[in-house]
């Protein structure tokens, strides 16, 4: 098996047609992304931050450490999407960054905007099943309100 060099990772995110690496983060806080199942065409839109803040192990008080998040390995939070990735394999999913943002607020806003612009709760594939893995927006609007039980 080929070794993965610095800046390379399995099934990398693409941004504007090129592979996105840690060197491209600059001062961006997070990104909005689309994951597409290349077999079915079903998609997922979400957001991810480049850093995470955690309390150090055994740490006392309010001290927190900032480190790079798991964004390179991240495949979304949808249980349905995760199940399909397990069934189909990571190679059958395209991961693309839609937009990059410098603040938490702008990242969150753009994710919500994209969810509504793409009608993730109401769009369906040719076979009538949901076109998106997203099952809710903001924990307030739900796909189940638009689709019959599957």
Where are the language model's segments positioned?
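Structure-specific nucleic-acid interaction/processing domains
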Residues: 2-150
């Amino acid at each position: 098996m080929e070794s993965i060099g610095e800046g390379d990772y399995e099934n990398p995110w693409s941004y504007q047609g090129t592979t996105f690496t840690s060197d491209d983060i600059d001062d961006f806080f997070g990104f909005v992304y689309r994951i597409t199942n290349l077999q079915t065409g079903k998609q997922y839109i979400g957001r991810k931050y480049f850093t995470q803040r955690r309390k150090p192990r055994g740490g006392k008080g309010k001290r927190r450490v900032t480190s790079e998040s798991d964004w390179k390995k991240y495949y979304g939070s949808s249980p349905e999407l995760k199940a399909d990735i397990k069934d189909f394999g990571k190679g059958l999913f395209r991961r693309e960054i839609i937009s990059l943002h410098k603040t938490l607020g702008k990242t969150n806003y753009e994710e919500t905007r994209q969810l509504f612009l793409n009608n993730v709760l109401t769009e369906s594939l040719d076979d009538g099943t949901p076109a998106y893995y997203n099952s809710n927006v903001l924990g307030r609007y739900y796909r189940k309100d638009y689709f019959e039980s599957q």
